[in-house]
Design a protein with these regions (language model features):
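Iron-sulfur-associated redox domains of electron-transfer enzymes in respiratory
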Residues: 2-301, 307-311, 324-331, 400, ...
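Terminal low-complexity/disordered tails
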Residues: 312-314, 319-322, 332-413
Length: 413
């Protein structure tokens, strides 16, 4: 396989997706300075990609969501069964068989540029300010240890691992809201100084393949959103597809361009101005604390696991967990959002007219033409009244308007 050194990147002729160059010249020089001179990137088809999973201030919920994915599954990625997608070698401190130095060996090899294959860094959880913990001789989030000059060992913060691995990574992917936006550990008043990966690496960060930080939010995220983003990114890195479309915050555009409300199974109730008054009601949940109309997330259409479940689908309200403002800007939870006072009031006014009109249409459409001619409905399940004089007149006007400008092939009695 031919190779190309990082200090002589090929010219980029056209803009691909949201990345129009590998990085700024100054940033590239800074990244190259962090890498050994012999560091190389493969050109041509990639057969294997290593995925180094790091965990910061997290609850491991993102790991659980990822292994629950089905479209594609983590097993598909590891086995290399997806056409065009290189086989993924996953290094995960919880899922791996190895432990101790045997586990961290490959991380060290990647840091030194001796891995012999491209790699991506996946970070779960927010990054705490380790200086705060170090002031008292501790640490917040660490993995592995390194020898000190005095012979002692010191834990290696995962933030340090990220700083070491990010410059040479083909891509850095933040999974979950803690990693993408800071999340709960970074909420106002936290004592850890936690921040997101994007905040930690900075605006000018670019991976070795020219990509800014990729963000797949959610607390926890939809597992399929994560694995699909991984697969699409690897297809691009392998030269089998264009760069996936990401929005201005690095989110997969095709997954986060619509709101929860636009695909919600309860959205029809909102349109008609009927709202739930208590949890367990079937109507729209906006008035009991749902932020769905202004939250970018696809869980109502994709479900939580295997296209099943999801907050609103199972009766829960949306608390905005995929958004950068979570949790502070959505607090207090389970309270009617301020904007709902206006939007739901408008829906109620419109619904006052829409609901009766739709019932009239349903009454018209719930009759066979034969039943209209014969004047009765032959149902043994209950008595169905014929429309009265006024309703009959409305139905005739409905039919006339329905076929306005069209040829009617049947006669209404």
């Amino acid at each position: 396989m031919s190779t190309i050194t990082l200090d002589a990147p090929p010219p980029i002729e056209t803009q691909v997706g949201g990345v129009d160059h590998f990085s700024s010249a100054a940033e590239r020089e800074k990244q190259i300075a962090l890498l050994p001179d012999e560091r190389t990137l493969p050109l041509g088809p990639i057969k294997v990609v290593h995925a180094f999973w790091l965990a910061g201030m997290s609850c491991d919920g993102c790991s659980i969501a990822a292994v629950g994915a089905t479209s594609p599954s983590v097993e598909d990625l590891i086995a290399g069964t997806i056409p065009g997608v290189p086989r993924v070698v996953l290094h995960h401190s919880v899922l791996s068989v190895e432990s101790g130095e045997a586990f961290t060996h490959n991380y060290t090899m990647a840091e030194k540029g001796e891995l012999g294959a491209p790699y991506v860094v996946i970070y779960e959880g927010s990054i705490a300010d380790e200086r705060i913990a170090a002031a008292t001789g501790g640490y917040f989030s660490a993995m592995g240890a390194e020898k000190m000059p005095d012979g002692s060992s010191r834990p290696i913060p995962t933030a340090t691992w990220l700083k070491r691995l990010a410059p040479g990574a083909a891509a850095v992917i933040a999974v979950g809201t803690c990693a993408t936006w800071g999340g709960i550990p970074a909420a106002v008043g936290n004592p850890t100084g936690s921040m997101s990966i994007m905040d930690f690496l900075g605006k000018d960060y670019r991976s070795a393949y020219g990509l800014p930080v990729i963000n797949v939010p959610g607390c926890s995220p939809v597992g399929d959103n994560f694995t699909e983003t991984i697969a699409c990114t690897l297809l691009f890195l392998n030269g089998h597809g264009p760069l996936p479309e990401f929005d201005e915050l690095g989110r997969p555009q095709w997954l986060f361009d619509e709101t929860v409300h636009q695909r919600c199974v309860r959205a029809g109730y909102y349109e008609e101005g009927t709202f739930a008054e208590a949890y367990g009601d079937k109507e729209c949940l906006v008035e009991i604390g749902c932020w769905g109309p202004v939250v970018q997330c696809n869980i109502t259409s994709r479900g939580a696991i295997n296209h099943m479940g999801g907050c609103m689908n199972t009766g829960g309200v949306c608390i905005g967990c995929t958004m950068p403002g979570f949790p502070d800007r959505f607090s207090p939870f389970y309270k009617k959002p301020p904007g709902a006072n206006i939007s739901s009031a408008g829906s109620k006014v419109l619904g006052t007219f829409m609901r009766p009109l739709r019932k009239i249409s349903m009454g018209y459409l719930n009759r066979e033409t034969r039943w209209v001619k014969e004047g009765h409905v032959p149902s043994g399940w209950g008595h169905v009244e014929n429309p009265g004089l006024v309703m009959g007149l409305i139905h005739k006007l409905y039919i006339k308007y329905q076929f306005l400008g069209s040829k009617k092939t049947w006669k209404a009695e």
